[in-house]
């Protein structure tokens, strides 16, 4: 078993991004990331704090706007439009989930697709499925970087993705297909799941069930990517994969924490820098 060290790869990418940001600044462009947080969800506050910290570390101009839980949908949409129109901001991120009185669909649709660093706008989803992506959801994008860094061969391989969310499962499956893997999407209603997972050369698990995947579910030598984050009764973090068991049969595996998580935030930064570069090139033409 070899560990896929997401923390180390994220640090390496951050150093490379800082160099790119410095070059953009020399050329007169300061990449900007605007983050909007509605309400006081503790997990969301941690995520936003981590994103802002990393943005500052690589030299981005970052803004975090914290809005009360009671903010109206209209007010939120107006704020997004201000960021859309401003050339100061190249990436816009609205932290999910949102309060029930605000339509997530309307909010995601309101963000300029070229500034949608989360990759959740329907236009960006459509471009991904058409094989011509502009912005890609950051968790699957980070996983693809891991595959590149660790020289994981995808072409012709059998890949199983457990989970069908728009955030991870669906875009992950599409990226694997674009890399010429043969892909199966499984989910909570899939029957005979073990029959599928035992055939997978690449197994990506994003179903939100604590240590559900055991050694008996995994093919010898498989590459296992664990997207899950679950806390046990003692508050300890675990993935959807039973790491202690599965590491004995996998050729490569991501730990939780320290695997996929660090890469997710780094890819948000990468897409912000890419958006700023694209804008600068447009302006110079």
From Swiss-Prot:
Known catalysed reaction(s)?
Answer: (6R)-5,10-methylene-5,6,7,8-tetrahydrofolate + NADP(+) = (6R)-5,10-methenyltetrahydrofolate + NADPH; (6R)-5,10-methenyltetrahydrofolate + H2O = (6R)-10-formyltetrahydrofolate + H(+)
Q: Name one GO molecular function term.
A: methylenetetrahydrofolate dehydrogenase (NADP+) activity
E.C. number(s) listed in UniProt: 1.5.1.5, 3.5.4.9
Entry's Gene Ontology BP terms: L-histidine biosynthetic process; methionine biosynthetic process; purine nucleotide biosynthetic process; tetrahydrofolate interconversion
Q: Does the keyword Protein biosynthesis apply?
A: no
Superkingdom to which the source organism belongs: Bacteria
Pathway(s) of this molecule:
One-carbon metabolism; tetrahydrofolate interconversion
**A GO cellular component entry from the record:** cytosol
What is the role of the protein in this entry?
Answer: Catalyzes the oxidation of 5,10-methylenetetrahydrofolate to 5,10-methenyltetrahydrofolate and then the hydrolysis of 5,10-methenyltetrahydrofolate to 10-formyltetrahydrofolate.
**Quaternary context:** Homodimer.
**Name of the protein in question:** Bifunctional protein FolD
């Amino acid at each position: 078993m070899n560990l896929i060290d997401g923390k180390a790869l994220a640090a390496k990418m951050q150093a490379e991004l800082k160099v790119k940001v410095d070059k953009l600044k020399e050329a007169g462009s300061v990449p900007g990331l605007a983050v909007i947080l509605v309400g006081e969800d503790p997990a969301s506050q941690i995520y936003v704090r981590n994103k802002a910290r990393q943005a500052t570390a690589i030299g981005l101009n970052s803004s975090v706007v914290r809005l009360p839980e009671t903010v109206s949908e209209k007010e939120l949409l107006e704020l997004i439009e201000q960021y859309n129109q401003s050339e100061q901001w190249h990436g816009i991120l609205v932290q999910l989930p949102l309060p029930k009185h605000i339509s997530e669909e309307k909010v995601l649709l309101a963000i300029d697709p070229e500034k949608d660093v989360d990759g959740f706008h329907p236009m960006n989803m459509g471009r991904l499925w058409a094989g011509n992506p502009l912005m890609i959801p950051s968790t699957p994008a980070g996983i693809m970087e891991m595959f590149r860094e660790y020289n994981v061969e995808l072409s012709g391989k059998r890949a199983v993705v457990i989970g069908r969310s728009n955030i991870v499962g669906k875009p992950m499956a599409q990226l694997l297909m674009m890399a010429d893997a043969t892909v199966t999407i499984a989910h909570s209603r899939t029957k005979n799941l073990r029959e599928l997972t035992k055939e997978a050369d690449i197994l990506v698990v994003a179903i939100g069930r604590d240590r559900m995947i055991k050694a008996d579910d995994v093919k010898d030598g498989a590459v296992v990517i664990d997207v899950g984050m679950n806390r046990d009764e003692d508050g300890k973090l675990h993935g959807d994969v039973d790491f202690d068991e599965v590491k004995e049969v996998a050729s490569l595996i991501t730990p939780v924490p320290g695997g996929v998580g660090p890469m997710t935030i780094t890819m948000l930064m990468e897409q912000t820098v890419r958006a700023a570069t694209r804008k600068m090139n447009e302006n110079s033409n």
